[in-house]
Amino acid sequence: MQPVEPPVEPHGAGHAQVGADHPARVAAVVLTGGGGTRLGGTAKHALEVGGRTLLERALDALTERVEDVVVVGPEVPTRRPVLFTREEPPGGGPAAGLVAGIGTLERLRGRLPDRVVALAVDMPLVTPATIDRLLAALDAPGPDPDRPPEAAVLVDAEGHRQPLCAVYRAAALLAAVPGARHSTYGLPMRRLLFGLRLVEVPAREGEAADVDTWEDLRDLRERVAPPPPEA
């Protein structure tokens, strides 16, 4: 599938319509993951880049269109109102965490969100503009109006899809889960993508960079550091 560059509405612009009187409900699931094995078991969400923790940066990246936010991971103080949940059993992987988060969102309002933003906590260069582009790509008319995209996924410079920086139609994503929702332990994220109609959104300015090692963290801290004052 070819990458697209969708038109972008201003940050906080009006909701896409899914019906004449039913605005699309946009929610988000932020996945904090476990302790990074290449980080000596350190909790990624608590690491700081540019004076903010990775969790704070992820929450700040969520556009104003996102009404409800579920964080899959340990409960910690946050400035933005969020709900916390965990996949059962813990350690089931990102697909299990994402499905658990969507289940929490469904229980919160009594129905599924129309669109759900999935964002890994270890992508600190993702911004509201990134999420706006993904939402715009999902809502853009495709070549077949009867078969609209079911997911808009960020793609890095090497062409690798980033399924944890994406926007999904929640019902379509859950329909792609093989078997029952509670049997997602260890399910690869790529398995969920197999049955979905995807649109790829190219990353800009390092948006797809993630934190897997101490070297990654050092590089990202240097990248966002302000320039030294002129002598």
Spans of features found by a protein language model:
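PAPS-dependent sulfotransferase catalytic core
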Residues: 210
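Nucleotide and nucleotide-moiety/phosphate-recognizing core
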Residues: 3, 15-186, 194-206, 214-218, ...
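Acidic two-metal-ion nuclease catalytic site recognized across multiple nuclease folds
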Residues: 219-220, 231
